[in-house]
Amino acid sequence: MAAAQRPPVGVEEALTRIATVADAPASTQAAQALWRMPLDAPVIVHDRASGSSWRRDSATGPALPVVLRNDQPPANTCITIDGAPAVLLLLPLPGDRDGLATLFWHEQWHCVQAALGLPATEGDTAHLDGEAGRTALRLEMRALAQALSTRDEHQARQHAAAALGYRALRSDAAAPPTRALEEEAKVERNEGLAEYSGRAIAAATHGGDATAAAVDALAKADASQSFVRSAAYVTGPAYGLLLDRWSPAWRRGLSAGATLPALLADALGVTWRGAGIAQNGAGYGADEVRTEERERAKERERRSAGYRERFLGNDAIRLPLRNPSISFDPRSLFPLDDAGTVYTPLTVRDEWGELTAVSGGLLSRDWALLSVSGGVVDGAGSRWTGPGWTIVLREGWRLERGGDGWGLTKEWGSGVGDPGDAGE
């Protein structure tokens, strides 16, 4: 009989820490109460150093290896294994208990969101990287922080109404304004509700509430260099906690088209697009924010020119995408107008293999084309490297340089993807 495969150092400890979070009675009760269904998908951990994944059948059982599909790049996410949802977490885990609990319950929510009638959606929030969008968002977040932290009921409502006003102001500056609201709402329903759930359930573990953590997250986000997809991670919990305060039943019957700001406006009894915004924003440091964002806009133009040279120049390497699986850091996205978005770092898997770009790559808006920096390219056979990236090709694919630069070619005689191949 073959010896059982042993996990890398740290895997057993990680699974034990996760079990402690998952089995805490206060947390499981809070999860059930929050969404009226259990959040108990099995958990898989992925060790990036060895490239291996592991799970346990029980809290005390041995770690067992798991093989991820080619279209499941390692990421903190919810995946499907044997037809059922499972939480996938990357090692190393967050070092603190609250951080781990927030991440764990965030991903658990993703595993039930479809059952809640809230399917995963992606929103195009590139307007959050422009000067006007960032300015209004930062002022909205500052107003949300004050609404959460003040004990005076009247003042809290005023700050909440101001936050809604800044959301309306930001959407009015976008083109078209209604689309901006809809796109932001998509991300808030997806990542915002997941992060709200993670923070609320994590706080319940020690009998507290998530307000202090939400306010701290808003303060840290104020200095963020990219809000394109990450803003919902802080605005979602803030709106959720304010709704808990003024409309406790808001989660019941939550629809796939719901927007958290509109729900809050209803709870406050205000017309949300005409909410009572303090025009000068003095209480939120508006002059300071506007000055900082004007300077950032100038720096953004310089970065944009550099990215265009790297990813749109003649020596850039362009890789076609047909059915990509992509993992990235949502805090570091850089929209490049109609050309797409720069993701740093980035891992992409497709039919031709896997690319890892620690220095980033440009994805077209329809995710049909990936571009990475050209320049000095080295390699042979299946493994190639370039400035800040590595490609590992599947059998039957080659990276070659032609008259138009580097590109991928398929060897039809290899039997991989030949015409008539029925596939998997």
Show which residues each predicted segment covers.
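Short pre-active-site segment immediately N-terminal to the catalytic Zn-binding motif
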Residues: L89-F104
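Catalytic zinc-binding patch centered on the HExxH motif and its immediate surroundings
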Residues: G61-G83
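Non-catalytic terminal regions of proteins
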Residues: T20, Y233, R252-E424
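Short, flexible loop/turn elements at secondary-structure junctions
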Residues: L93-G95, W109, G117
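Post-HExxH zinc-binding segment in Zn-dependent metallohydrolases
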Residues: H46-G51, A115-P176, A180-T211
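Active-site-proximal alpha-helical
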Residues: T178-A210, V215-A278
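Active-site recognition of the HExxH zinc-binding catalytic motif
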Residues: T102-A115, E195
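N-terminal mature-domain "stem" immediately C-terminal to a signal peptide or N-terminal signal-anchor/transmembrane
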Residues: A4-P65, A86, P94, V342-P345, ...
